[in-house]
């Protein structure tokens, strides 16, 4: 891609009010396997393999919010509206009328209300870790988030901290950032050379 620096892949909103069943907002892998709504990994694969976007120009989107359904379980039917829930509203729900569950297919958590009336899919520090590892393994250009203000809790910015620990501290990531900075520097130097040549041409005329 010669005219675009990078693409921010919106690897979230995989499921929502338009779906025919309860599903994760941002499942790393399909849950259940083969779910036609797809997943983060199938989305990245489509952009890379089908659309031909280089992996190092793809940024993996990390959501700092979840989706709440009127339903009794993951992959079940639901009724009514699906409500977006910011991450900073979620930790206090755990063990306070809601039970934490982990989906081994999606590599994502979810909460079930104790009376089985609602389910909340979201990302936490653990699922963010898996997504960061995926971005590193696939040698993607980076990660991006939506949105900063959704992450602030009494324990600090927990999801940002997970990105810092599992992505920014990676040796592979540090090398990638160094390569990107070198590329930016080289492009800047090239632009300066072109500008100088253009100015000389004007003077010669």
Kindly give the residue locations of the regions a language model identified.
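Substrate-binding surface in catalytic domains of secreted glycosidases
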Residues: 1-93
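Flexible, active-site-adjacent loop/turn segments at secondary-structure boundaries
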Residues: 10, 26-27, 63, 109-110, ...
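Short secondary-structure transition/capping segments
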Residues: 20-33, 102-104, 190-198
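Active-site rim elements
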Residues: 31-34, 115-125, 147-150
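Soluble or luminal CAZymes and related metallo-dependent hydrolases
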Residues: 35-42, 120-127, 155
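Acidic/aromatic/glycine-rich contiguous surface patches that form carbohydrate-binding/processing clefts
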Residues: 67, 124-204
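Hydrophobic, secondary-structure "cap" segments at the distal end of domains
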Residues: 83-140
């Amino acid at each position: 891609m010669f005219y675009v620096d990078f693409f921010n892949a919106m690897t979230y909103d995989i499921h929502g009010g338009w779906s025919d069943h309860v599903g994760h907002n941002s499942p790393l892998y399909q849950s259940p396997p083969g779910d036609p709504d797809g997943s983060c990994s199938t989305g990245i694969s489509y952009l890379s393999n089908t659309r031909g976007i280089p992996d190092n120009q793809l940024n993996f989107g990390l959501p700092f919010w979840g989706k709440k359904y009127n339903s009794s379980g993951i992959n079940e039917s639901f009724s009514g509206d699906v409500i977006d829930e910011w991450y900073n509203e979620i930790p206090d729900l755990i063990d306070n009328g809601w039970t934490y569950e982990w989906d081994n297919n999606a590599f994502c958590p979810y909460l079930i209300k104790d009376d089985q009336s609602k389910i909340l899919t979201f990302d936490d520090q653990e699922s963010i870790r898996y997504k960061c590892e995926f971005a590193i393994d696939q040698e993607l250009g980076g990660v991006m988030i939506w949105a900063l203000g959704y992450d602030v809790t009494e324990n600090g910015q927990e999801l940002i901290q997970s990105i810092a620990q599992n992505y920014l501290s990676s040796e592979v990531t540090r090398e990638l950032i160094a390569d990107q900075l070198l590329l930016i520097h080289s492009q800047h130097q090239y632009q300066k050379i072109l500008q100088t040549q253009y100015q000389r041409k004007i003077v010669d005329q």
